[in-house]
Regions:
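Low-complexity, disordered linker/stalk regions enriched in Pro/Thr/Ser/Gly
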Residues: 1-215
Length: 215
């Protein structure tokens, strides 16, 4: 039998070379996000600043994984998540953090008008004018003929501008700024498939901050 053995002393803590939320995105519309952690010699990790784990004292060590799905705390705003790793002999890294903004708000669209409730394709009676504004800054908007008051933005038919209608689509509208729109009878007829009738016209806005559409 041998009269000796080898004993390794390891006092070097592992490091975290990269830590991101949703691949470095600045905004998320969901509380469920994916953490990406790059580290050498990590055997375990603990994460805090998430739902149910407010501080490091609340966090528990778990097996290290380079990718981890977590739930952010509720409520819109800036969210900072922290991670720390340790090796197999409990040398701990410094904490690393990453920040993302949770934004789940959708624009509220308010219509003023219209000036008339019936139009034809005859000059002098062929234009409906209204305006709208948004509670949030928009990156896009569209005016559509929809099947129901509660239709979503991907329902219905986009009203065109071939007949002279204006501002049926657009980009970059500041919050609380009024935008005037005109619907011409020929464009309404095209969207309606040429059939007379009473139709629901709805304006949809897409928020600049998170790309969510109004309801």
């Amino acid at each position: 039998m041998a009269s000796y053995f080898n004993l390794t002393l390891d006092t070097l803590a592992p490091t975290i070379s990269a830590f991101t939320i949703n691949s470095g995105a600045s905004v998320t519309t969901s509380t469920t996000v994916t953490l990406s952690i790059t580290s050498t010699d990590a055997a375990a990790m603990k994460i805090w600043g998430i739902n149910g784990v407010a501080s490091e004292a609340d966090a528990s060590w778990e097996t290290f994984s380079s990718s981890k799905s977590v739930t952010l705390t509720s409520g819109d705003g800036s969210k900072t998540v922290y991670v720390k790793v340790r090796d197999s002999v409990y040398n701990e890294s410094a904490a690393s953090s990453a920040t993302i903004t949770l934004s789940t708000a959708i624009p509220t669209i308010t219509i003023t008008g219209p000036d008339v409730n019936i139009i034809s394709e005859q000059s002098g009676k062929n234009i409906c004018t209204f305006s709208f504004s948004s509670s949030m800054a928009l990156k896009a908007w569209k005016v559509k003929l929809v099947p129901a008051n509660n239709s979503a933005h991907d329902a219905g038919t986009q009203i065109g501008t071939t007949g002279g209608s204006t501002n049926m689509t657009g980009t970059t509208l500041a919050a609380s700024t009024s935008k005037e729109c005109k619907i011409y009878g020929s464009d309404l007829s095209t969207a309606a498939g040429g059939a007379d009738g009473t139709y629901i016209i709805k304006v949809f806005g897409q928020a600049s901050v998170n790309s969510l559409w109004s309801a």
